[in-house]
């Protein structure tokens, strides 16, 4: 029952034995945020009249797309057998781009609720997050959600879940986040089954940052889980990775609105406000300690967020460049994984090369720039970072085709990923064919049940950042799901394909591609530009080249005036003279003429990824 009417445990004076830290892990769309809503309601921290769907998803984009991007932490009281417990629920993102955030959120917990949609079953990202939870030695409570749906098959999927984590299908809880059925039983089970946090209250303070958000009025709000010792307001604290020191202006818990407290003790989850304005000073995974009595060792598992996908962002209107720069700076306050640097393109003008965690991250960032800052942007095709070694042993890191070195190249290394694909078994052939065509190497295959297969492949990252997810969805009729993680790099036979108009290179259309696919890219791009560039007074050749070797060509025919219109009958030599004269003029025009590529052609040619990105939700 909810103890809101009685005494709820007070932050900073809570015995670790009555604290339970847990998170909910699930694939996108399996009802994680809806279940969180019901928990908030049943524990009484949000009144029914204040309730709104997906209460914890604060960003417009999160609400519209129905995805969780930023983690949230909420403290909820719950009473079992006459004892009041403090439950800390850490809501995690479900998408593959945000795996590091999920891993830090899991490290802040002792247990996880593994949520599976009773109508869809286990999906790739459920598995990936489950393995992360197992690596962190979390106690796992299996739960089937959406059992009120007519299409639900609880018996079938309860067996799948039991096979996966070991146990009995009858132990799998059945709940409905929508109607609230089974939620109270789940809350009781969390209290009974999950272990209490362990830590030394007298040791130097150590707290792990699992998220940080930028608040316009208060600066950076850092969410932490205290492992050892205590943190009090007005203390000086230190971040152990950057050695930066701050004064702790406010400390408290989210319940779910921020509530200041007298401090945070062992096992507690809460927020810190230091008045700092830059999220990069509060890095996810870092350890916070007390400056007066610092800890000697930081908590394990910290890693810097590393961008995987790079894309050029250019404003359609060149005068918007300063606005774009300010907008990116502001977004960086809230998103420590975003990196950018200015770049120029002869065709597109001034812009930025921006690094992202993955395609969803790219799409969300771009959408936020367009929506919150009213910018019209062109984004170039997404690239990955290549490591090019020249024959003189120099190493160049390339994120943009225009930086690709022209000298003698000894080898090129490209990033690899290990991908896990889950799908019904009738699609195995189609999936293997797709992965083979993307230079994939099969790693193994397991049957989760008689009709669901887990297929593992090692693929180049460049092959999956463009349209892989889309094609996978269409080949599996929407039933396939994908999860991937970085897996080193390997040597590859890559070349740079240049597109030339009238013999002049257009940098915006260049691409780094595998030698086997260079011809296909050249033919596709020249064909597309032929359709998009308006006809000129003279013939315009469009060529694709690798170095100095032309691999594909299309021509835009010249517009000709009918110079013979005024000749009624008459001698053929008269007509020939007029045609020769026209030909001379066209030749002269071709020598001095320049082709202006209209903005629309750039947008159409570069947004081949638009339709493809739409499915990556």
Curated annotation (Swiss-Prot):
GO biological process: positive regulation of translation
Top EC group: hydrolase
Matches recorded under Pfam families: EFG_C (PF00679), GTP_EFTU (PF00009), LepA_C (PF06421)
InterPro entries, per database record: EF-4 (IPR006297), EFG_III/V (IPR035647), EFG_V-like (IPR000640), G_TR_CS (IPR031157), LepA_C_sf (IPR038363), LepA_CTD (IPR013842), LepA_IV (IPR035654), P-loop_NTPase (IPR027417)
Positions contributing to GTP binding: 29-34, 145-148
Membrane topology (UniProt): Peripheral membrane protein
Molecular functions (GO terms): GTP binding; GTPase activity; ribosome binding; translation elongation factor activity
Keyword Glycosyltransferase applies: no
Matching CDD domains: EF4_II, EF4_III, LepA, lepA_C
Residue ranges constituting the tr-type G domain according to the UniProt record: 17-198
Compartment(s) where it occurs, according to its Swiss-Prot or TrEMBL record: Cell membrane
Gene Ontology CC: plasma membrane
Protein name: Elongation factor 4
Lineage: Bacteria, Bacillati, Actinomycetota, Actinomycetes, Micrococcales
């Amino acid at each position: 029952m909810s103890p809101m009417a009685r005494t709820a445990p007070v932050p900073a004076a809570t015995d670790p034995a009555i604290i339970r830290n847990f998170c909910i892990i699930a694939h996108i769309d399996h009802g994680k945020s809806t279940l969180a809503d019901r928990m908030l309601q049943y524990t009484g921290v949000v009144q029914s009249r204040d309730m709104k769907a997906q209460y914890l998803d604060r960003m417009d984009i999160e609400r519209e797309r129905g995805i969780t991007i930023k983690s949230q932490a909420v403290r909820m009281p719950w009473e079992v057998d006459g004892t009041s417990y403090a439950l800390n629920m850490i809501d995690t993102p479900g998408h593959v781009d945000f795996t590091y955030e999920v891993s830090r959120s899991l490290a802040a917990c002792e247990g996880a609720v593994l949520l599976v949609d009773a109508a869809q079953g286990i999906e790739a990202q459920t598995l990936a997050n489950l393995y992360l939870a197992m690596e962190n030695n979390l106690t796992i409570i299996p739960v089937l959600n959406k059992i009120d749906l007519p299409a639900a098959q609880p018996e079938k999927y309860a067996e799948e879940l039991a096979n996966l984590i070991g146990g009995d299908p009858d132990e799998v809880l059945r709940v409905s986040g929508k109607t609230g059925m089974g939620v109270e039983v789940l809350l009781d089970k969390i209290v009974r089954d999950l272990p209490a946090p362990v830590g030394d209250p007298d040791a130097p303070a150590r707290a792990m940052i699992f998220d940080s958000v930028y608040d316009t009025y208060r600066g950076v709000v850092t969410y932490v889980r205290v492992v050892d010792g205590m943190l009090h307001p007005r203390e000086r604290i230190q971040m152990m990775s950057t050695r930066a020191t701050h004064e702790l202006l406010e400390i408290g818990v989210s319940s779910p609105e921020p509530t200041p407290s007298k401090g945070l003790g062992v096992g507690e989850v809460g927020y810190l406000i230091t008045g700092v304005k830059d999220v990069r000073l509060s890095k996810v995974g870092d350890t916070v300690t007390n400056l007066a009595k610092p800890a000697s060792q930081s908590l394990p598992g910290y890693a810097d967020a590393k961008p995987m996908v790079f894309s050029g962002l250019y404003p359609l209107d060149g005068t918007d460049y300063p606005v774009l720069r300010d907008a990116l700076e502001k977004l960086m306050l809230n998103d420590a994984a975003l990196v950018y640097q200015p770049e120029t393109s002869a065709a597109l003008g001034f812009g930025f090369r921006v690094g992202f965690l993955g395609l969803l991250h790219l799409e969300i960032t771009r959408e936020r720039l367009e929506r919150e800052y009213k910018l019209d942007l062109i984004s170039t095709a997404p690239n990955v970072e290549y490591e090019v070694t020249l024959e003189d042993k120099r190493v160049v890191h390339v994120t943009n085709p225009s930086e690709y070195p022209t000298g003698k190249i000894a080898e090129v290394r490209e990033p690899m990923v290990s991908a896990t694909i889950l799908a019904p078994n009738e699609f195995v052939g189609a999936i293997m064919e797709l992965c083979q065509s993307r230079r994939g190497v099969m790693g193994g295959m397991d049957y989760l049940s008689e009709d669901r297969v887990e297929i593992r492949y090692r693929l180049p990252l460049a092959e999956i950042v463009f349209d892989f997810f889309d094609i996978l969805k269409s080949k599996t009729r929407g039933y396939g799901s994908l999860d991937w993680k970085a897996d080193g790099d390997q040597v590859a036979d890559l070349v740079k394909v240049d597109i030339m108009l009238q013999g002049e290179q257009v940098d915006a259309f260049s691409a780094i591609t595998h030698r086997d696919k260079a011809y296909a890219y050249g033919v596709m791009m020249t064909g597309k530009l032929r359709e998009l560039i308006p006809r000129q007074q003279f013939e315009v050749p469009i060529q694709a080249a690798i170095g100095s070797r032309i691999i594909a060509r299309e021509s835009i025919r010249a517009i000709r005036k009918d110079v013979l219109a005024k000749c009624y009958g008459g001698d053929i030599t008269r007509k020939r003279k007029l045609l020769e004269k026209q030909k001379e003029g066209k030749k002269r025009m071709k020598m001095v003429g320049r082709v202006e590529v209209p903005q629309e052609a750039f947008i159409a040619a570069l947004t081949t990824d638009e339709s493809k990105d739409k499915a990556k939700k």
